[in-house]
């Protein structure tokens, strides 16, 4: 199968071994499907039919062909067609209507994909959009030689005319919603369309450039970083396409005279098409769904709805925060993404929760009306995470050009902080003075440690309204106290977690960058925690007082071939712990599931036995006695205390019941 040019600038999805063809016509913006009658295979075709009828092989429908699955991958652009999502009813409807002529043209209903011609979003390769762009450019230039947009850009902006792709955005994309809006650009949820046929949903960054060469270079740096990933990554955002086009500006744009304005005139914009993550970003998820904090952007109706849901579920899930399983899933996904970035020599430099995206939405306990799902899945599952926004990334060894506040200051490593007010690159201390440090892979690891702190506590260790000078001082002086943080976690009455999470944070937040573990080491450490679990044991409480020994794990140079080259292959990857829809057959996941089921059974037994013992004590003692009061207190503690403390409270009830029985029947 291949994409080949056809008359009037059309594209044909073509396979020379079968008897059908799909034509994409940019002139009319339509898709057309042609198919040769299989019963006439032995007959002679005329020259025109032989030239135009080529095949798109389908596994079922009017005509069935037997061919390998590889025939559904275009060798020119790499785009996959999913043969399992074929609209069979549409095929049968057309078959019953007698559409079996030697060459029959089928119209495409609005907002539908013909004959199962459906693409998985991730299967759209960069070459597909490049082919579409070349075809669109050919048609646009052919029909509009006096390109008004090109003349306008030539007189006013530094970008050459031939870099613009006029009309590409409006021709092939429709905006569904606004995902985010900042001072320098916007992010939209868009659907890729050809005519009225919707082919996939993506996230699209539209960044006005104007005459700001520095800003243009920064945007191109992000594109180069994304382009350096030559294969599909499990935990890095997937980049699909980039192009330049004149469009109305959003935010501040530098004009030809160097001034800034926020006018709505058409200016050069760079469009970056990438993977759409329906779960939003990690920061919003933690604040709004995990710790139940209202967002400033939420409407009163949304807040009322959340309040009613929370009130309805009151008492069903008293603890907030994430479980150990969920924390490990998040940290491991981010560490994997960092490992892959570092393996190709890239430093992210702006790693923070808002740049970590959830592939699917996270459903909190308060949002889950299904009691079974809330009890069985909520503490074990968290959506897979990908790292996005590589606009600040740089190659290892490059000199920094800023103040040390490239991204959000709170997530910046202390060794990068330059004391005092922000300075420009022109006033940055010289390299020879050695008064500042360069970004390294360890800088990203400190950011990962601060992300760990944020997802554990739902906040950062700094006051939110600090002056920038005071904030720099706090960051420089911050030291992670493991025991103190464990006490803080207990005082906040969050879900109990494994102490090794705190030891991991301590290692990542070391002020000395040489003392921080690498992304590969963090990933291997978390995997080792899973592998060492034993069926039937308390999975996350085993070795609870032991510290993580990073020195026992071999340190590797991050700038090596990516480990994902060996075994990441499309969707056959376990990205989270555990995902119900994925085929998880690893030993660690089996152990985790066994522990979860056993632990739930034990907790229910503790509660039932405690209630029975309390009834026995009341029957054996007088009303108002100290034994009855103590039994009620212990019963309440059994229901309210963390799971790992219920056993000792239940044993205390057994002792009280024994004393009560002795007083009644012996004395």
UniProtKB/Swiss-Prot annotation:
Q: Which reaction does it catalyse?
A: L-seryl-[protein] + ATP = O-phospho-L-seryl-[protein] + ADP + H(+); L-threonyl-[protein] + ATP = O-phospho-L-threonyl-[protein] + ADP + H(+)
Task: Tell me which residues bind ATP.
Answer: 179-187, 205
Q: The Protein kinase domain covers which part of the protein?
A: 173-530
**Which residues carry the post-translational modification Phosphoserine, per the record?**
96
MF annotations from Gene Ontology: ATP binding; protein kinase activity; protein serine kinase activity; protein serine/threonine kinase activity
Where does the source fall among the domains of life? Eukaryota
Entries under PROSITE patterns matching the protein? PROTEIN_KINASE_DOM (PS50011), PROTEIN_KINASE_ST (PS00108)
Listed InterPro entries: CC_SR_Kinase (IPR050339), Kinase-like_dom_sf (IPR011009), Prot_kinase_dom (IPR000719), Ser/Thr_kinase_AS (IPR008271)
What's a single GO CC term here?
Answer: cytoplasm
Upon gene disruption, the observed phenotype is: Hypersensitivity to copper sulfate.
Q: Which UniProt keywords apply?
A: ATP-binding, Kinase, Nucleotide-binding, Phosphoprotein, Serine/threonine-protein kinase, Transferase
Please indicate if the UniProt record lists Phosphoprotein as a keyword: yes
Its Enzyme Commission number(s) read: 2.7.11.1
Does the keyword field hold Phosphoprotein? yes
What residues form the catalytic site here?
350 (proton acceptor)
Q: Which Pfam families match?
A: Pkinase
| PANTHER family, A to Z | EUKARYOTIC TRANSLATION INITIATION FACTOR 2-ALPHA KINASE EIF2-ALPHA KINASE -RELATED, SERINE_THREONINE-PROTEIN KINASE IKS1-RELATED
Record-stated family? Belongs to the protein kinase superfamily. Ser/Thr protein kinase family.
The note filed under miscellaneous reads: Present with 892 molecules/cell in log phase SD medium.
- Name the record gives this protein: Probable serine/threonine-protein kinase IKS1
């Amino acid at each position: 199968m291949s994409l080949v040019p056809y008359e009037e600038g059309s594209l044909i999805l073509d396979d020379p071994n079968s008897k059908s063809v799909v034509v994409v016509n940019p002139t009319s913006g339509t898709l057309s499907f042609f198919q040769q009658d299989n019963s006439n295979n032995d007959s002679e075709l005329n020259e025109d039919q032989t030239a135009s009828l080529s095949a798109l092989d389908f596994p079922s429908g009017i005509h069935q062909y037997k061919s390998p699955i590889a025939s559904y991958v275009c060798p020119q652009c790499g785009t996959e067609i999913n043969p399992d999502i074929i609209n069979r009813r549409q095929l049968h409807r057309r078959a019953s209507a007698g559409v079996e002529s030697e060459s029959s043209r089928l119209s495409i209903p609005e907002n539908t994909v013909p004959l199962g011609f459906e693409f998985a979003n991730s299967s759209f390769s960069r070459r597909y959009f490049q082919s579409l762009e070349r075809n669109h450019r050919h048609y646009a230039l052919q029909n509009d030689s006096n390109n008004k947009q090109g003349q306008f850009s030539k007189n006013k902006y530094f970008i050459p005319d031939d870099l613009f792709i006029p009309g590409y955005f409006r021709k092939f994309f429709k905006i569904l919603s606004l995902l985010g809006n900042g001072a320098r650009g916007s992010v939209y949820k868009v659907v890729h369309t050809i005519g009225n046929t919707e082919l996939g949903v993506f996230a699209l960054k539209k960044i006005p450039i104007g005459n700001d060469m520095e800003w243009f270079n920064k945007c191109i740096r992000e594109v180069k970083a994304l382009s350096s990933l030559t294969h599909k990554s499990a935990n890095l955002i997937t980049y699909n396409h980039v192009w330049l086009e004149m469009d109305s500006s959003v935010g501040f744009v530098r004009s030809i005279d160097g001034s800034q304005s926020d006018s709505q005139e058409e200016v050069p914009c760079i469009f970056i098409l990438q993977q759409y993550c329906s779960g939003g970003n990690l920061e919003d998820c933690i604040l709004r769904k995990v710790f139940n904090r209202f967002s400033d952007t939420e409407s009163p109706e949304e807040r009322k709805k959340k309040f009613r849901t929370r009130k309805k579920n009151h008492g069903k899930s008293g603890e907030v925060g994430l479980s150990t399983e969920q924390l490990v899933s998040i940290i491991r996904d981010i560490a994997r993404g960092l490992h892959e970035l570092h393996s190709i020599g890239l430093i992210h430099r702006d790693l923070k929760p808002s740049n970590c995206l959830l592939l699917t939405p996270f459903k909190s306990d308060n949002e889950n009306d299904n009691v079974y799902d809330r009890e069985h899945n909520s503490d074990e599952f968290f959506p897979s995470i990908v790292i996005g926004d590589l606009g600040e990334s740089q190659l290892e060894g490059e000199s920094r050009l800023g103040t040390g506040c490239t991204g959000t200051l709170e997530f910046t490593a202390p060794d990068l902080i330059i004391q005092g007010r922000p300075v420009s690159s022109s006033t940055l201390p010289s390299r020879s003075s050695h008064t500042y440090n360069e970004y390294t892979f360890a800088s990203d690891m400190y950011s990962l440690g601060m992300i760990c702190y944020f997802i554990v506590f739902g906040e950062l260790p700094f006051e939110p309204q600090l002056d920038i000078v005071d904030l720099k001082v706090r960051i420089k002086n911050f030291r992670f106290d493991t025991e103190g943080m464990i006490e803080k976690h207990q005082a906040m009455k969050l879900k109990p977690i494994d102490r090794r999470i705190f030891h991991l944070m301590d290692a990542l937040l070391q002020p000395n960058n040489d003392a921080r573990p690498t992304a590969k080491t963090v990933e291997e450490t978390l995997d080792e925690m899973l592998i060492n679990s034993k069926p039937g044991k308390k999975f996350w409480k085993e070795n609870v007082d032991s510290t993580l020994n990073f020195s026992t794990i071999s340190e590797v140079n991050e700038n090596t071939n990516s480990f994902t080259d060996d075994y990441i292959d499309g969707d056959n990857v376990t990205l989270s712990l555990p995902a119900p829809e994925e085929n998880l057959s690893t030993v660690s996941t089996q152990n985790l599931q066994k522990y979860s089921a056993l632990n739930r059974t034990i907790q229910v037994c503790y509660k039932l036995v405690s209630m029975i013992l309390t009834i026995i004590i009341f029957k054996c003692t007088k009303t108002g006695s100290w034994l009855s009061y103590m039994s009620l207190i212990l019963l309440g503690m059994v229901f309210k205390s963390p799971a790992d403390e219920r056993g000792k409270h239940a044993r205390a009830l057994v002792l009280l019941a024994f004393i009560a029985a002795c007083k009644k029947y012996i004395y």
